Swiss-Prot record:
Subcellular location: Cytoplasm
Function summary: Catalyzes the ATP-dependent biosynthesis of glutamine from glutamate and ammonia.
GO cellular component: cytoplasm; membrane
Protein name listed in UniProt: Glutamine synthetase
SUPFAM superfamilies to which the protein is assigned, alphabetical: Glutamine synthetase, N-terminal domain, Glutamine synthetase/guanido kinase
Major location (coarse): cytoplasm
Subunit and partners: Oligomer of 12 subunits arranged in the form of two hexagons.
Domain GS beta-grasp positions: 15-99
EC number, as in UniProt: 6.3.1.2
Binding annotation for L-glutamate: N267, G268, R325, E331, R343, R364
Chain sites annotated for binding ATP: E210, H274, S275, S276, R343, R348, K357
Note on cofactor: Binds 2 Mg(2+) ions per subunit.
Residues the record lists as binding Mg(2+) 1: E132, H272, E362
Length: 474
């Protein structure tokens, strides 16, 4: 919307903007904000910044060194369609208040450094990313945990388990079965108008949508695909995408979750990520003579993704819930191989006709619980390491990997089965991320400590309700 400070300030004056919503991303990937009146938003903010308490933000500073500085990024500004008073929202970079250097734990800074590193390699000058984020639309969610009990419950007018319940006006049916929600027309698809409204608002905020549809899961699983863009821009778009989806749903009395696996015995929500490298305006992943139309550069890029996948998943699939999705039987990509067209492989080469510009790699493992700034940056660094070191991936497999006999399947490498395992893999394999100081040692150590303490240990130490079913009378 804007390219420089003057554009923002002129728009504020000309359009009678009343508030500036200051946004930045915490380490796990949740957008934070505070709001200031435009009367106190002076031009000096673009040079002197705004201060905030970094010790109160997850994964940031200790209390004895808590002051942090925010500097605006004018290119991220948009008019927030959900605010009662005209508000211009803008995402900021985080800096050290003394040295003014960019903060090493700022996720946006890491994404920016990854793009700078790419240009410095001379391999390519631009990386494009295109995520396909899935989510569930529920009518109601309740959950609780305390030392003596726990529960969670979700519900949806569209849920398969509600075919027999009494509903106001009568139960009219048309509820997708478990794993039976892919592409039905209304009335089975209850939420097509809601997704269209989400699409409309996404366009209003500057995000191009290519498609929206019902996904496989019952109870309102959905997908809205946005247009690819450069790494940092796509990560910004995905954060805004989540904001829009959640708020449109809430305005219609619904609630959305991007949890990878909110339902047992139905498909999880993934986020397939398409990526490609370009140089001087030309695509680098196409060769008419290569397998699947891939160039050597693309093949080595895939080699890097597969070689570093156990460590990479610490950023692309960073929650304990991620590994409830990554299991056989629910269309999840658990096999660390690549293939043309084959959706059961974790790396797929989508059909794009004969157009070199359409040639790309689809990494099917990630899920929308990730911090996109860190996930896309880590993917790029893994792919570049593969190119730089000419890492050949294993031979492609064009069979249906879900139907392989046990002896053949045993030879196919699998994704790690838990967050704990991928964190261990990241601890052992992170040199590729630290190239060019894109991911600092401090960032990696902070990520490992945060995830182990606040997620792995937090889950490990608490009794699970199903354990009572299994063991109460043992």
């Amino acid at each position: 919307m804007f390219t420089k400070a003057e554009d923002v300030l002129r728009y504020i004056r000309d359009e009678d903007v009343q508030f500036i919503d200051v946004r930045f991303c915490d380490l796990p990937g949740i957008m934070q904000h505070f709001t200031i009146p435009t009367q106190v938003f002076a031009e000096s903010v673009f040079t002197d910044g705004l201060m905030f308490d970094g010790s109160s933000i997850r994964g940031f500073q200790a209390i004895h060194e808590s002051d942090m500085l925010l500097l605006p990024d004018p290119q991220t500004a948009f008019v927030d369609p959900f605010r009662e008073h005209k508000t211009l929202a803008m995402t900021f970079f985080i800096h050290d208040p003394i040295t003014k250097e960019q903060y090493s734990r700022d996720p946006r800074n890491i994404a920016k450094k990854a793009e700078t590193y790419l240009r410095g390699t001379s391999i390519a000058d631009t990386a494009y990313f295109g995520p396909e984020a899935e989510f569930y639309i529920f009518d109601d969610v309740r959950y609780d945990y305390n030392p003596y009990g726990s529960m969670h419950h979700v519900d949806s007018v569209e849920a398969a388990w509600n075919t027999s319940r009494k509903e106001e006006g009568g139960n009219l049916g048309y509820k997708p079965r478990f794993k039976g929600g892919y592409f039905p027309v209304p009335p089975t698809d209850h939420f097509t108008d809601l997704r269209s409204e989400m699409t409309r608002v996404l366009y209003e905020t500057g995000i191009t949508v290519e498609m929206q549809h019902h996904e496989v899961g019952t109870a309102g699983q959905a997908e809205i695909d946005i247009r690819y863009d450069t790494l940092l821009k796509t990560a910004d778009n995905l954060m805004l995408y989540k904001y829009v989806i959640r708020n449109v749903a809430r305005s219609r009395g619904k609630t959305v979750t991007f949890m990878p696996k909110p339902l047992f015995e139905d498909n999880g929500s993934g986020m397939h990520v398409h990526s490609s490298l370009w140089k001087d305006g030309e695509p680098l992943f196409y060769s008419p003579n290569g397998y699947g139309g891939l160039s050597d550069t693309a093949r080595y890029y895939i080699g890097g993704l597969l070689h570093h996948a156990p460590a990479l998943l610490a950023f692309t699939n960073p929650t304990t819930n991620s590994y409830r999705r990554l299991v056989p039987g629910y269309e999840a990509p658990v096999n660390l191989v690549y293939s043309a067209r084959n959706r059961s492989a974790c790396c797929r080469i989508p059909l794009g006709g004969d157009s070199p510009k359409a040639k790309r790699v689809e990494f099917r493992v990630p899920d929308p619980s990730c911090n996109p700034y860190l996930a896309f940056a880590a993917m790029l660094m893994a792919g570049l390491d593969g190119i730089r070191n000419k890492i050949d991936p294993p031979d492609p497999i064009d069979k249906d990997l879900y139907e392989l006999p046990p002896d053949e399947l045993a030879a196919v490498p699998q994704v790690p089965g838990s967050l704990e395992k991928v964190l261990d893999a990241l601890e052992a394999d992170n040199d590729f991320l630290r190239e060019g100081d894109v991911f600092t040692t401090d960032l990696i150590e902070t990520w490992l400590e945060y995830k182990r303490l606040n997620e792995v240990d937090a889950i490990r130490l608490r009794p699970h309700p199903y354990e009572f079913t299994l063991y109460y009378d043992i």
